[in-house]
Amino acid sequence: MKENELKNEKSVDVLSFKQLESQKIVLPQDLFRSSFTWFCYEIYKSLAFPIWMLLWLPLSVWWKLSNNCIYPLIVSLLVLFLGPIFVLVICGLSRKRSLSKQLIQFCKEVTENTPSSDPHDWEVVAANLNSYLYENKAWNTRYFFFNAMGCQEAFRTTLLEPFSLKKDEAAKVKSFKDSVPYIEEALGVYFREVEKQWKLFNTEKSWSPVGLEDVQLPKDIHRSKLTWFLKRIFTIYSLPLWLAFLNCICVSQHFCLAFRILCPGLFFLMMVWLFQNMRTTALLVKMEHKMQFLLTIINEQESGANGWDEIARKMNRYLFEKKAWKNEEFFFEGIDCEWFFSHFFYRLLSAKKSMWLLPLNVELWPYIKEAQLSRNEESLMKK
């Protein structure tokens, strides 16, 4: 009995120690007022910033010795406005270079701490890497990653996507050299954790729709897709875009007829494109939303266009309840929902390189294939 009590006390001590240890995790987001102040601090501590400041010394001498102030003024303006761009580019390249030299350590941290797709799981990895990079003089501050999401994003862009897109072993060795076995082990750990998360989500965390009979699709409410679209873009958030659009119309009045038609037309098409991609911030940022979308597709019994209408109706309610969207009009209809799945999920399976501002969702590829297969099977069964 006493031995059992001692074991229980030890286990409690270990648990309490782990809880205290997790509470001690301090990231830059806990120290700085915002990501902007952290970013300014990182810029200030970079090598590029003092170089930019030193450029003003010869300019000051030139101003003093020159009889003609026009040329010094032009150069000063160039340094003033192009200098910050130079500093930002150099800092970005330095961060990328520093992290690329520490891929093995990055992989070891992932393997040891077994993070899943939940950003909170990456806090320990981010904190450990911040300390490691500073102590080993790979970075000049203790604040390489601002938060856990920054660390997770670095894992996605530096390891997960580039490595997964390499189809053969030779290409992997050529790009990642000695890091290949460490990356394979880290990705294996990560994929297993995501699989656990998927199974848990499928059995316990999956959202169940209630009162769907009251949910109408926007196609049943609005006269046309154009009126639905215009209603959504006429908001306070899109006011700067509309002001720019009106300015474009006013400026184009001074040019020929073709330009007056072409310029506002292209600007409006750009706004449509921005609107289509704006929805990705609601559905594609959180992993739980993406998993729910795929589960809804897989579990939908109705086939064809009616099936996609049901999926759209369920997701409209889900995103509204989760406060990811301001109303129940995320998808206009089933066709719009099918297009969204095809464009932002299924087509990524054939991607050959990383996409700008759009994750490839490599960890969800098996479930995306399952979702597509379930829709194809439903269509075949109907035929």
Curated annotation (Swiss-Prot):
GO terms for biological process: protein transport to vacuole involved in ubiquitin-dependent protein catabolic process via the multivesicular body sorting pathway. One of its GO terms (cellular component) is fungal-type vacuole. It is a multi-pass membrane protein. Residues 64-72, 254 are extracellular. Keywords: Membrane, Transmembrane, Transmembrane helix. The keyword Membrane applies. Residues 1-42, 94-232, 276-383 are cytoplasmic. It comes from the Eukaryota. The chain crosses the membrane at residues 43-63, 73-93, 233-253, 255-275. The keyword Transmembrane helix applies. It is found in: Membrane. InterPro entries: DUP/COS (IPR001142). Its main location: membrane. Present with 815 molecules/cell in log phase SD medium. Belongs to the DUP/COS family. This is Protein COS5.
